Amino acid sequence: MKKLILSISVLVVGTMAYAADKTAKPIADINPPTVATEAEGLAAFQRIYEVASHPRCANCHVGDDNIPRWSGPSYAPFPPGQDWKYHGMNINADVSRIGVETLPCSTCHQTTPDLKSESHAPPHFGIDWQLAPVEFEWFGKSASFICNQLKDPDRNGGRDWMGLAHHLVDDAGHRGPVLWGWKPSGNREPAPYSLQQHVDDMVVWGVAGQPCPSEEE
């Protein structure tokens, strides 16, 4: 009888959790406008670029050297002539981008839905800490480069602009790096604007045809 009661309790709790999950309000809304001009799309992308190139995003969107960066005011001082430095402790995430070959990122960066961490303590979020795929290299890249990368399915995970918007909302819903970018805690500077504004800009840029600035801009 006790086993039956326990089984029923687990079933009820599981069903309630599933129902709550299915009806919970998304952490950000995706509401594409009916129309958007090229000028509006370019303005939206400029704000997207400000987010993508910000230290909270770009520091882990690095190239095939697989070394995360430390940039932004909380990581000063920097080497002469630079506004950034390599991650301390000789960290290299290797080809796996999670450090499995040497020292996993999760050794210091916990996986926990609690985004709060002390200043200069390893930050953490709700999914395993890792570098973004190398195709998503943003650190030190121009607005034109990042724009063309984001609109290229071969370099953005096979997504169209709506897929990119859903990626932002889904990642944030799992309390991943997207949400952490605006809630980094400690003395870390958050990404500009807000998650909702970023999603709004993504869909405006998409409806406008994903226009990109020229390299000179």
Which residues fall in each region the model found?
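C-terminal capping alpha-helices of c-type cytochrome domains
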Residues: 156-216
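Gly/Gly-Pro-rich "capping" loops immediately C-terminal to redox-active cysteine motifs
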Residues: 69-106, 115-150
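Post-cleavage N-terminal segment of exported redox proteins
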Residues: 2-43, 55-58, 63-73, 199-217
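Stable alpha-helical elements in mature extracytoplasmic
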Residues: 41-48, 53-56, 101-104, 142, ...
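The canonical Cys-X-X-Cys-His
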Residues: 53-64, 100-113
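Electrostatic cytochrome c docking/interface patches
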Residues: 30-51, 81-96
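Phospho-regulatory, low-complexity terminal regions
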Residues: 20, 141-151, 158, 214
